[in-house]
Structure formats: C-alpha cells, structure tokens
UniProtKB/Swiss-Prot annotation:
Organism: Ostreid herpesvirus 1 (isolate France)
Binding site for substrate: 222, 237-238, 266, 447-451, 660-664
Record site: Interacts with thioredoxin/glutaredoxin: 830, 833
Alphabetical UniProt keywords: Deoxyribonucleotide synthesis, Disulfide bond, Oxidoreductase
Catalyses which reaction(s): a 2'-deoxyribonucleoside 5'-diphosphate + [thioredoxin]-disulfide + H2O = a ribonucleoside 5'-diphosphate + [thioredoxin]-dithiol
Swiss-Prot/TrEMBL GO biological process terms: deoxyribonucleotide biosynthetic process
Disulfide pattern: 238-464
Protein name: Ribonucleoside-diphosphate reductase large subunit
Amino acid sequence: MACSMANAVRPGLSDLPEGVDLSNPKEVRSLLIKLTHARKSTVYDTKIRRLHGVIVNSIMENYNSAEGELDMAITPLIPSHPDYAFLAGRVSAYMTQINTPKTFTDAVYGIQMAVGETNGFRSPMKPVKGGLSDEIVDFVNEHGARLDGMIDDVRDYSHNYMGITGLLNGVAIKVNKKLYERPQYVFMRVAMAMTDLSSETALEDIWQTYMLISGQCLSMASPVLFNGGTSSSNTASCFLLDMGDNMVSITKKVAQTMTLIAKNGGIGINFSKLRATGSKIGMAGKSSGIGGKLNLFDRVAQSVDQGENKRPGAIAGYLTDWHADMYDWLYSRYSGSGNEVNKRHVLNMGLVMSDLFMERVENDKEWSLFSPNDVVGLEELYGEKFVRAYRAHEANPKIKRTTVSARKLFSDIANMMWSTGEPYILFKDAVNERSNHKHLGTIKNSNLCCEIVQYCDTNEIAVCNLATICVSNFVNVETGEIDFEGIADAAGVACKGINNLIDKQNYDLGNEQLMRLADERTEEVVEVNGIKFDAKYNLVSYSNLKHRPQGIGMQGLHDVFMKLKIPYDSEMAFRLAALIQEAIYYGAVRESVKIAEEKGPYPSYYWDNNTHREGKLQFDFLEGFDRDRDLTHELFNWREVLKKFEKFGINNSVVTAQPPSASSSQLNDNVESIEAITSNRFTKGIKDGKFIIINKHLQKDLEDLGMWDAQMVGDIEANDGSIQNIERIPKNIREIYKTAREIDHKAVVKICAAIQPFIDQTISKNMFVPKNVDNPVQLIMENVILGHKMKLKTGMYYTRGIPAMKQQNFGKMNFQDKDIGKPVPELVDCEACSA
C-alpha cells in the first residue's frame, strides 16, 4: 500500500534519523534540540533560545512543569509557521514516551495490574473485568515479543500538537489518572481488536492494520479508539431507534437511549409516530404532543455521561414533514418562541422531507399536516404509494388536518436553519428508492450526523460501524499522482477489520433494556463463532449481525485538492472526488465479496426482495448509470468483482457512508470529511487553552513563492483567514485557497452528487453560509432545492452561519521577519547537548 505515511514520517518533516534509541534520554534530548534548531532566523531568536534552555531541560527533569512550558513557549510561534505545531507535537510525544511503559507488552500488563488492584485482584497475566479483553491479554501472553517488535515509536513524532494531545486526552487508556498508552500503543490495541486473533494470519493482519492506522492512512471512529480491545468493547458509532406511540415504547426508548449513550454511541430517534397535540387518548384524554417528549430526551442527553475524556451524549430526533406538531417542533430550540416547558437545549433535530412536499414548495401549493394516529401507516410509505395515500387523506373530510403554505413552511424551516443550524434535512424518497434495506422495510430516520440510513423499528435497533480513509496521504506531490489502488486496499482493510469488530463486539446480551418485549419475541437465531444471538435476547446484536452494516468514508478530500493545486469548486475536483470515492467503494465491495466467498453473505441477504440478491449495487439504482460506460475499468477490476458478487453475494448489507470525521480529522491533521477548509487561519482548543493554526498547504506555497513573511502573517490575520483580498498573492493561488464560505455554495452539493453513486448510505453534508450575502435564508433554500434536484439523500446536516466573534479577536500576533524562519532540511548539531 503506497500511502505516503505508511512507511515514513510526514513528508517535509522526515528529519528524524533512523536508529535513534528512543529509550535513551541523552539521545532523545539531543534529537529534540536538533529539531528545535531546524529553524533559522536572520537574527538569533530569543524565543527559540528559551525553548532550548527551558523546554528540553524541563522534559528531562519534570514532566508536569514541562507541559506548561510547552504551551507557553511553542504554541505562540505556531502562527508563524505550521512546523512549530509539529515541533510541539514531537516534544509532547517524547514527554509521553518517558512517562509510559517501555513496551506495548508492559503497557498491557500495567493496565491489567492497575485495574486488577482497583478490583482487589493482582495478576497482569489474566483477564480483569474493566481492563483489556480476554483475547488481547491471551494473545499478548503468547506473542508479546512479536508485537513489541512491530511498534515503531518514531511514528509518534509524525503528529502535530493538536493531534497528539487529542489522542492522549481523549483516547489513550488511563487507570486512576495514570497514563499507560502512547499513540503507538493505542494503534496496536485497535489493530488487534480489528483482527481475528484465532486466524493463522493474525500477526500479518495486525501488522497490516497497524501500519495503516499508525501511518495516518486509515482512521477508525471514536468508539473503536476508545473501546477497541477492552472488555467493554462497544465499537459501534451510531444507533438508530424507532419510537412507538405509547408509554411502554416511549419509556423503553428512554432506557435504551441512556444505555447506548453510556456505550459512547450517537443516537438517532424517529419521533414521527407520536400523536399530535390535542389528539384523543383513551376515552377522554388528550395528548400533550411531541413537545414534552423532546424535552424528556433533551434531559437524557444532558444527564448521561460517556466517561472521562470522552464525547458528551448526543441525540438527534427526526420528524416527518406532514406532522401536525411541525411548528412546535420547529421552534423548540428558538428562545423567542414556543412553550418553555417544551424547549430543547442539546437535542438535535432532523426533518424527513418527501418529494411531494418539495414539489408543492416549487409550485407554491398548500401542504397538509396530520396527527399520525389519524393517518396510521402513512409514515411507512414513500414514492407513488405515499403520494396516493397522502392525497386520499387530504380528500377525506373525516380526517382532521391543518393546512399551510408549503413555500411558507419551507421558508420558516430555512429561517431556523440560519438561526440555529438545524434542522437536518433527509430526503425520504431518495433514501428509500436507493436503499439496500428495501427487503427490511421503510427507512424513516437517520443518525446523529445524518449519514447513516438503515432500517429500524420498535423491535430492531440499527447499528453502524465507521471508518475513514485519509485520502490526502495517498497523493504523490512530486508526480501529481494519486494511488487509487492503495486507497482501495485501505478500504478493504477497513472492511475486514470492521467485520471482525462486529463479531467481537460486547452486545451486553443480558441487559433488559436491549431485549425485545416478551410478547414480541421470535425464534430467529444468528450464530457467530459458536455464540448464538437470539432475536428474543438483544435488539442490537440481532440487527448488527443480521445485516453487518458498515460506513467507510474519507477525510482530507480538500487536502488532496490543495496538494494538487485544484480549486475545490472546479469540474476537475468533482471528477477527482468521484474517482476517490469509487476507489473506496471498489475496495470495500471487493473485500466484502471475498469474505462472502469464504463465510457466506450477511444473513438477511437471503430474505425476499433483497436488491443484492438481484445483483444490484448502489450505482445500479441511479437512472441512466451504465456499468460499462460509467465505472472506471482502467483503474479498477470491476468486472471480476461483479462476477464474484453475483456468484457469492456480499458479507455486508452496506459498506460506505460519509461521516463528518471532526475528531479523527483533528488527530490526523486533515480537513474534515469532504468539506472545504473553513479558514486559512483558525483557532483550535487544546486542554485549557487555544492556539492559532495557519493552513499548512497555503503556507508552503507562499514560502515557495518567497512571499511568507511577517507582513503576510499579518495580512491573513487582518482578513480573518481569507486571502481573496491580498492582491499580491497570485490569482491562481487565491482560487485554490478559497474557504468554505468563499466557494460557490453549489460546489459541495456537486461534490456530494459526484460521490453518491458509490455510497450505500448517505453523506453528512454541511453548508457554510457566505459572508455578506444579501439573503442567507434564500440561499439556504436554494441549496436544499439543488440537493433535492441532484438526488442527494441528505439535503443538509448543519447549516453554519457566520460566527459571532471574528477569529482575529483571539490571540492577535505581532511577528517580525526574523520570526518567520524556513525549515532547514538537514539537522544542525548543537554543542549544548553533546555531553
């Protein structure tokens, strides 16, 4: 696999010599001071001298004080050159290495011993409740020396300060506040979790996976990093729930939501079955509507803790576009309107839109709102069946309805999107017409980030398991080539690894909250590795093992464009995005078919009306798509893969999705997901403080042009991270480095449309509203309408308005040219550390 990071440290920073003994304090001290000297100034820089005299010596003497010195001494220099962020990361990496066990095996035993002591049991060689998983400990007992030999500690030095701090604070295992893992130990633990350790090729598979993850070519979702290889081992990212219109179901969903949030999952819930305000209950009762339920789940999200250093609980509730409580729901987060009792503060909301609603918006027609208990079954329909039933309900005088202007409602929705960033928009017809889960039923909601579309009902909790390919590290900058086969191979490794995670996940089988109600149990059984997962036992295991869903996507797409000098809003970018996504889909499908050849397809593959059994993949749902014409056969051996797919089936019902990748992109120093960079100068929070980052690609290009100086740093700051008004920068450079608010808002829609044929699920698509736009609400409406016309499944995740505070209000920097040094390719000896 030719990922540029898989076998080396970061290009342009590959100044770490081979053979450095990282366990020798004297050698590492010498190395760090040499790295500090890898910057030169026309005048000797007192800040860098202070870095020598204080930071490195503090590292050798006192870890805690060194952390504070690092923040004070290095981070203020980062705006002058991105390499300071890597220097800070390298110093932090060394501090971590001298304060964690010397080998991976020692770390495993240390964790087990510490957890065992907490539980009153001392034996590092045996499994301990709350520690690492039994299979990890057993495998380390047998193969510890081989695993230790795989660890490449130099790779810890390829992370910038933001990335390594995120890993250490949010992912690495601590017991009683003592840190046991450095980044490489995290990656090895995750690689082992993603491997079938009973396989004859286990060590080879661990090595392959470890190389990709530690090389920043493959990034696993947060729950995998948190829990992979531990006894808790919930590695799923997303859970989708469907709530019924009765107190038993509502109570059950509250309990299930609390349970799943505690497992580090993000939650998406369908609220559309709940009857509207004033609807009849029993003989004389009346419903309070969805408002109180929103507030209930809002409090759940605020009250459940996912554990130290992990992300807070988060829930998204979805509502259909014809629900009679539409306006109560719409204003539930707007402080100036609605009933305060029904307010939500952290609960996110999504709207499920039909083609019929969009048609009536376009034609300026009326739209009818109903209570679900008056139109039972309507939410299960889509397409022409929905249109016929909806019109019949409108024509029925016995059914109560509220009539509104479709265009006015759409405008009010867009106003809320501008004001609050929500609701998300999910296009129901596009989702279901191109669903791999048609054989299961109608999809009625998405997940927390609006990229997962899987079937769920009151007796089945949909699950998804995520990864992203760091596509920017498959670019050869010197030749301008992209290693598409390497991307496909990485997607295959992700697919194989996620399948192992699905099999090994701790499904909490005895948890009453995750069981079917007694009168709704069946005798269906799924068997994996000799363990029978009964439908009557657990709703999560049933869904995950029956359908084996995955969501493999990408991060760093804009990094690819910037490396290759391609504007984000160009036709070249749209075509390149499609090729990259095709590579990911090809690699994932190829591996899933290979697994099916060995182990068989996913169990629900054999159910009636399964589109995979009909020989269809996602691109086959698109009208006019021709496999011979539209697949890139010169790059990918699609014909061979499709032949095997038709013969053996596929091991996963869905393999691709496009998640937002916010935290993992930070760890890997990439622009998030498929998005354009938000600014060329931005602030990042680390620990208790913040520091400013300059776009590293822009800085390099300006440095190559001889334009990187103190004046340029100041100009970028004065323009709030934009370079469009800095006329001394060549126009072609300004085109390449337009930010998310400066590119044509249609560009991200076109990127999504380009990659959608190769995404089984959907795309977490944001909109960044341009500055100084005359009518932002109108622009939001146009963006959603364009997404609908281009057949996207997700019309919108977040709508990003203009931040209230300009970024230059924080940490205004004053640099002189002497502060703006250039990296020196060779290391410079320093007499101060030669002793």
